[in-house]
C-alpha cells in the first residue's frame, strides 16, 4: 500500500488518483491503523499540491502546435521557460520519491510516518511553487515582468526556497539575456508574443499592437519603409522589468537602433582608393556591421553571457555592461558622423534652409512665390516648387539644395482655399540626410523642423508683402502728383512691419542663434553621439517652446491654422490674418470705396491683438525666467506705445 502511495506521488492527473478513493472504503482499516489515517490524509494533501504544480508545467511546457505554427499567445516563451525551470526544481522532489521507493522495497517493515516525514520536508517547496504559479495567473504575468517577479523573490530567508527560485529563474533569465544580446549586437528581435521590453510596432498597425510580429515581419517593413524603420522600435513600457530603469532601456534601444542603421546600409565612402582594406569594406554587403563592432562583438557577447551565467541578476553589473556597450557604440557613431559625414556642415545646411538662414535665397523665393499665390489654387501647387528651384538658381546655391526639396501638401479641410496662410501651411521641406544620421533626424524631428520652417516662412512672406505695400503706395504718390499718399495705410503698414520685424529678429537672433550656438559647441567638442542626440533634442524643444509652437503641456505641436491651447500662438495667428488682409486690401487693382474704413477696422483690430499679445507676454515673463521672451517684450513695447494706448501695464 505504501508503494502505491509513492506511485501516486508522481501522478500529475488528479482524476487518476486511485489512492484517494481507497480512503473512502472500509478496506482501509485492514491496512492503516485509525491513528495513521490523519497522516495518510496529510500525504494526500502533499500529493494534491504537487499535482497542481505538475499540471502547470504540463500545460505550459508542451508544444501547443505540432505543425510549426505559432503557439497560443497565452503560452509565451517566458512561461515555457518557467515551466522548464519548475521541472528542474522538482528534480529534488523526484529524487526523494525515488529514494523512498528504494527504501521501502529494501525493507519488509515500513512506517507511514517515515514516508510522511520525508515528503513533508519537500512540502514547503511545493507550496512555494504553487503560490508562485497562482500569483502569475492572478496578476497575468508574462515576459520581462514575469522575470522581475522571480527576481524579487530571489532574496529568500529559507535556503531551500532560495536555491529553488534560482533554479526556476535560470531558464527565464537565459531567455531574457538571449533577447538582450540579439538586440544589442545584431538588432534582431524575434518576439512573437511581445514579451521583451523593446517592441516593434509597424506604422500600419491598426491598434498599435506588436503581437504576432516576428523578425520576418520587421524585415518586410524595413524594405517597405526604410526611412521610418528604426523608429518603429520603441520601449515597451508594459514589459519593462522593475530592475531596468527607463534611462537604461533608452540606452538599449539606442544601441539596437544604431546596429539597425549599420545593417540597413553603411554606404562606406572610400577616401583613400589605394587602400585595399578600405576598398574591400566598401564592397561588402550592407548587412555587414563590421565597421561598427570592429571585431569586438564576441567580447561584448561574452559580457552578456557572463551576466546570464550568474545565479541571480546582478543589476549593477548589468547596468555597467549596457553602459559600456552604449559608450563604445556612441563613440564609434560620433566618429563616423563628425569625421566622415561632416555633421557640422549638415547642421549648417539645416539652419540655412529649415531655419531660413539663407536670407537672400528666401527673399528671392518670396519674390517668385508671391506671384504664384495670386493664381488659382491648382496652379499654386504646380508653380511653387518651380519658384523654389528658380530662387536657388538665381542665388547660385543649387549644389547646396541637392538634399532639400519643397513639397506641397493639399488639404481638403482648409476653411478658405484662397487663403495665403493656408497655402503656406501646405509647404514643407524634405531632407535627404546622409547615413548614419538616421538616428538624428527621425520623421518626428523632420516634422518639427517643418513646423518651425512654416512659421518662419509665414513671417518672411508677410514681411515681403507688407514691404510691397509701401513700394506701391510710394509709386502711386510719385506717379499721380495730385494724389497724396494715404497716411492711414502708411501708418498701419508701419505698425505691421514693426511687429513682423521684431518677431523675425526675436526668433532668428534671440532664439535660433543662441540655441544653435549651444548645439554646435556640443558637436564641435566631438562628444559621443548620444550626447549630440540629446543636445539636438533639447535644441528643438527650446526653439519650439520659444516660438510658441508647443501647447501648455509641451507634448503636442500646435496645428497651425486650427484651434490650439497656446494663447500666445493663437494671438499671433490673428495678427498674421490682419497682415494678410491688409496686404490684399491695399494691393488690389480696384480698391473698394470704403477702403479707409476697412483700414480703420484693421488698425483697431491690430491694436487690440498687439495689446493682448503684450499682456500675454507679460504674464508668461512673470511666471518664468525666459531671457529671449524679455527681449521680445522690450522691443515690441520699448516706449509703452501699445500698452499705454490700450491700458496694458507692461
Swiss-Prot record:
Modified residues (Phosphoserine): 214, 218
GO cellular component terms given for this protein: centrosome; cytoplasm; gamma-tubulin complex; gamma-tubulin ring complex; microtubule; spindle pole
InterPro entries (alphabetical): GCP, GCP_C, GCP_C_sf, GCP_N
Record's protein name: Gamma-tubulin complex component 4 homolog
Family named by the database record: Belongs to the TUBGCP family.
Residues the record lists as Phosphothreonine modifications: 216
Pfam families given in the database record: GCP_C_terminal, GCP_N_terminal
GO BP annotation list: bicoid mRNA localization; cytoplasmic microtubule organization; male meiosis cytokinesis; meiotic cell cycle; microtubule nucleation; mitotic cell cycle; mitotic spindle-templated microtubule nucleation; spindle assembly
PANTHER family, per the entry: GAMMA TUBULIN COMPLEX PROTEIN, GAMMA-TUBULIN COMPLEX COMPONENT 4
TM annotation in the entry: none
Function summary: Gamma-tubulin complex is necessary for microtubule nucleation at the centrosome.
GO molecular-function term, one example from the UniProt record: gamma-tubulin binding
Subcellular location: Cytoplasm, Cytoskeleton, Microtubule organizing center, Centrosome
Keyword vocabulary terms for this entry: Cytoplasm, Cytoskeleton, Microtubule, Phosphoprotein
Superkingdom classification of source: Eukaryota
Species assigned in the record: Drosophila melanogaster
Amino acid at each position: 500500500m505504501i508503494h502505491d502511495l509513492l506511485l501516486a506521488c508522481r501522478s500529475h492527473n488528479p482524476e487518476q488518483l486511485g489512492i484517494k478513493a481507497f480512503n473512502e472504503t472500509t478496506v482501509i482499516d485492514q491496512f492503516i491503523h485509525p491513528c495513521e489515517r490523519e497522516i495518510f490524509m496529510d500525504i494526500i494533501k502533499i500529493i494534491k499540491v504537487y499535482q497542481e504544480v505538475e499540471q502547470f508545467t504540463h500545460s505550459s511546457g508542451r508544444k501547443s502546435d505540432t505543425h510549426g505554427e505559432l503557439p497560443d499567445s497565452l503560452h509565451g516563451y517566458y512561461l515555457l521557460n518557467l515551466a522548464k525551470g519548475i521541472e528542474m526544481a522538482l528534480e529534488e522532489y523526484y529524487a526523494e520519491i525515488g529514494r523512498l521507493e528504494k527504501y521501502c522495497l529494501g525493507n519488509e517493515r515500513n512506517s507511514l510516518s517515515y514516508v510522511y516525514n520525508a515528503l513533508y520536508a519537500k512540502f514547503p517547496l511545493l507550496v512555494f511553487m504553487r503560490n508562485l504559479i497562482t500569483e502569475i495567473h492572478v496578476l497575468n504575468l508574462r515576459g520581462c515582468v514575469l522575470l522581475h517577479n522571480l527576481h524579487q523573490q530571489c532574496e529568500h530567508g529559507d535556503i531551500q526556497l532560495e536555491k529553488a527560485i534560482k533554479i526556476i529563474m535560470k531558464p527565464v533569465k537565459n531567455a531574457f539575456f538571449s533577447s538582450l544580446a540579439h538586440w544589442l549586437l545584431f538588432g534582431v528581435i524575434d518576439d512573437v508574443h511581445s514579451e521583451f521590453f523593446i517592441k516593434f510596432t509597424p506604422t500600419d498597425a491598426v491598434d498599435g499592437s506588436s503581437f504576432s510580429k516576428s523578425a520576418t515581419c520587421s524585415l518586410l517593413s524595413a524594405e517597405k519603409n526604410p526611412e521610418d524603420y528604426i523608429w518603429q522600435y520603441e520601449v515597451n513600457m508594459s514589459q519593462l522589468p522593475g530592475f531596468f530603469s527607463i534611462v537604461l532601456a533608452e540606452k538599449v534601444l539606442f544601441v539596437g537602433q544604431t546596429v539597425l542603421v549599420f545593417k540597413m546600409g553603411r554606404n562606406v565612402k572610400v577616401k583613400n582608393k589605394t587602400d585595399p582594406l578600405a576598398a574591400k569594406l566598401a564592397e561588402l554587403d550592407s548587412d555587414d556591421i563590421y565597421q561598427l563592432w570592429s571585431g569586438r562583438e564576441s567580447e561584448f557577447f561574452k559580457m552578456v553571457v557572463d551576466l546570464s551565467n550568474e545565479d541571480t541578476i546582478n543589476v549593477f553589473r548589468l547596468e555597467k555592461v549596457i553602459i559600456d556597450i552604449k559608450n563604445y557604440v556612441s563613440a564609434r557613431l560620433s566618429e563616423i558622423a563628425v569625421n566622415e559625414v561632416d555633421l557640422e556642415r549638415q547642421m549648417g545646411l539645416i539652419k540655412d534652409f529649415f531655419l531660413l538662414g539663407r536670407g537672400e535665397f528666401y527673399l528671392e523665393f518670396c519674390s517668385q512665390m508671391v506671384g504664384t499665390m495670386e493664381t488659382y489654387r491648382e496652379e499654386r501647387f504646380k508653380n511653387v516648387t518651380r519658384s523654389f528651384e528658380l530662387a536657388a538658381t538665381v542665388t547660385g546655391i543649387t549644389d547646396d539644395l541637392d538634399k532639400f526639396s519643397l513639397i506641397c501638401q493639399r488639404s481638403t479641410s482648409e476653411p478658405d482655399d484662397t487663403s495665403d496662410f493656408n497655402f503656406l501651411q501646405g509647404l514643407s521641406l524634405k531632407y535627404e540626410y546622409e547615413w548614419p544620421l538616421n538616428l538624428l533626424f527621425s520623421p518626428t524631428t523632420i516634422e518639427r523642423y517643418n513646423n518651425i520652417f512654416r512659421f518662419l516662412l509665414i513671417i518672411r512672406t508677410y514681411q515681403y508683402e507688407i514691404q510691397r505695400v509701401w513700394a506701391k503706395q510710394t509709386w502711386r504718390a510719385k506717379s499721380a502728383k495730385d494724389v497724396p499718399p494715404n497716411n492711414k495705410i502708411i501708418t498701419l503698414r508701419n505698425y505691421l512691419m514693426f511687429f513682423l520685424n521684431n518677431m523675425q529678429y526675436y526668433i532668428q537672433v534671440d532664439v535660433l542663434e543662441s540655441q544653435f550656438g549651444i548645439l554646435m559647441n556640443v558637436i564641435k567638442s566631438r562628444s559621443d553621439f548620444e550626447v549630440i542626440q540629446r543636445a539636438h533634442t533639447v535644441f528643438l524643444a527650446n526653439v519650439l517652446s520659444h516660438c510658441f509652437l508647443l501647447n501648455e503641456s509641451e507634448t503636442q505641436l500646435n496645428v497651425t491654422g486650427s484651434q490650439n491651447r497656446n494663447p500666445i500662438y493663437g494671438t499671433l495667428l490673428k495678427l498674421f490674418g490682419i497682415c494678410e488682409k491688409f496686404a490684399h486690401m491695399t494691393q488690389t487693382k480696384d480698391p473698394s470705396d470704403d477702403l479707409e474704413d476697412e483700414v480703420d477696422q484693421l488698425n483697431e483690430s491690430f491694436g487690440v491683438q498687439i495689446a493682448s499679445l503684450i499682456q500675454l507676454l507679460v504674464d508668461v515673463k512673470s511666471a518664468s525666467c525666459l531671457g529671449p521672451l524679455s527681449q521680445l517684450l522690450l522691443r515690441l513695447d520699448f516706449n509703452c506705445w501699445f500698452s499705454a494706448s490700450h491700458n496694458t501695464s507692461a
